């Protein structure tokens, strides 16, 4: 992921499930599009081993290549799903993809079976934002992935995570999203940077000691 993306402050954190592995099935990515928009994505490939990491790399590379020619997240997810099915992919993957116009704050996003994103506001409030979309990638042929457009204000941070951050044996998804949203909103209220917010969210997830890969992506307009 580039160190600098014009108009945005983006921070990412990752912790693999297995000790000794630098990578697992979770991934994130952010890159500049030809039209000046910035593509941001986070995903979770099935499994935690080396094979999961290899599959994750295929999905991530495919999405980046498709994004160079497709106009929106809906098209990228649709064609990635078709590609994985045509390849007979042995695994599936969930993903959220956003296209962000850093000047206007317009965000277009779609979801493929991934956990909702969080919007953390400067006033200390937060929202759980469930984007429209379809099933996980690589399972159902001809699946549709409708998208949604909304505005990212400058006093708001988008927090994107994988399920290991917000769900586990002793933590329901709803409770985990609420917990993470509250933590992120307090960080934004306190004036913390995207990097500091990402650290807080990851550290809180690590403390739960869930046996899963963890990925966090925080996005703010500057």
Where are these regions (language model features)?
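Cytochrome P450 core scaffold surrounding the K-helix E-X-X-R motif
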Residues: 119-121, 169-173
């Amino acid at each position: 992921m580039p160190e600098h993306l014009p108009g945005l402050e983006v921070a990412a954190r990752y912790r693999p499930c297995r000790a000794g592995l630098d990578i697992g099935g979770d991934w994130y990515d952010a890159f500049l599009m030809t039209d000046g928009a910035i593509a941001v994505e986070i995903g979770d490939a099935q499994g935690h081993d080396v094979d999961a990491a290899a599959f994750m790399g295929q999905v991530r590379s495919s999405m980046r290549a498709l994004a160079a020619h497709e106009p929106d997240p809906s098209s990228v997810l649709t064609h990635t799903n078709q590609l994985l099915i045509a390849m007979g992919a042995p695994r599936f993957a969930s993903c959220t993809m956003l296209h962000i116009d850093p000047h206007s704050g317009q965000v277009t996003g779609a979801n493929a079976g991934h956990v909702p994103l969080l919007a953390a506001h400067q006033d200390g409030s937060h929202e759980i934002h469930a984007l429209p979309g379809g099933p996980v990638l690589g399972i159902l042929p001809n699946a549709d992935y409708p998208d949604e457009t909304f505005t990212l204000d400058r006093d708001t941070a988008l927090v994107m995570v994988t399920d290991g951050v917000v769900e586990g044996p002793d933590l329901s998804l709803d409770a985990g999203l609420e917990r993470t949203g509250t933590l992120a909103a307090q960080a934004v209220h306190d004036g913390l940077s995207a990097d500091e917010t990402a650290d807080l969210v990851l550290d809180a997830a690590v403390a739960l000691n869930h046996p899963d890969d963890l990925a966090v992506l925080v996005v703010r307009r500057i």
